[in-house]
Amino acid sequence: MEENIDLPIDIDQKKTAQKVRDFFKFNFEHYLIRAGYHRTDLSSPQLDPTGIMSHGGNSAENKMATIFEAQDKCQAVYHAIEQCADSSKQPFRTILKSLYIEELTDWQVAAKVQYSDSRYSDLKRYALCQFADTIDTWKTIYNVKIPELKLFKNRVNIGERSD
């Protein structure tokens, strides 16, 4: 039985969750490397999202603009995680931070949130779907291009082939 977590009714939770897992594995890793960040930098208070972008034509300025953009993408991801629900019944923020910032394993996170493996799997899927929804706000705030992560039932999705 699918649990309502305030997502669009026609979202394909399994496909969306897989797309978000892939995003964290590939895109987010790339953003961190490009930004010169370590995952622990995202949870530390000294991080300063200035949003300063240089628009000159010089090569050094272009490289800095690329770095600033990657830093803004990392900030958007972090804030999207922070915006996710975090209660005893919906520990979505805890799950996402534990997996993708602290790099804990699934079994460690399941123990941390004190749920059985099967219930944890459901909660993880819901957390990934909620992240897919919240990232839209933060990519607008930071004015960055981050791929669409939500996939829908009975629709042709952006970035997917139709059969």
Question: Which residues are covered by each model-predicted region?
Answer:
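Short, locally clustered residues in the helix-turn-helix/winged-helix DNA-binding domain
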Residues: E82, K97-I101, A132
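Amphipathic alpha-helical interface surfaces
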Residues: K73-V77, P91-F92, L123
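Short acidic, glycine/proline-enriched loop segments that cap or flank alpha-helices
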Residues: C84-S87, Y115
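Helix-turn-helix DNA-binding module
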Residues: E102-R119
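N-terminal interaction/assembly modules
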Residues: M1-A85, D136-D163
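C-terminal low-complexity, acidic/polar tails when present
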Residues: P49, S54-H55, Y115-S118, Y126
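Short amphipathic alpha helix immediately N-terminal
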Residues: S87-L104
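DNA major-groove recognition helices of helix-turn-helix
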Residues: Y120-W138
